[in-house]
Amino acid sequence: SRTLLAVRFGENHPGQLHKITGFFAESSIDLTFVQSRPYKIRPQQYVLIFEMIGHKSDPRLKKAFTQIEQEVRQSEGWKKVLGSFPYRERQVLDDEQLKP
């Protein structure tokens, strides 16, 4: 499974992304995608999107989400788990399999 998480801090400060990714590292969560997007209501602020391996019910993810929730509340921000979805590894084809 993969899970998507969105995070927005109330105010931007240096080191916020580092701190959030540290929570994932402490819980041995593998991030597969990270993106920042402008927040439409306040263009000077950003929403961080994280994709990770694991289901939202995984205890490791829950622990990291709790730590992130506490961190963003201090800056009057928010976090939202967008959901979990099944994921299947892509098959890599070799030259023999590609021949007609």
Predicted stretch roles:
Residues 1-100:
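A conserved regulatory-domain signal marking ACT and ACT-like small-molecule sensing domains
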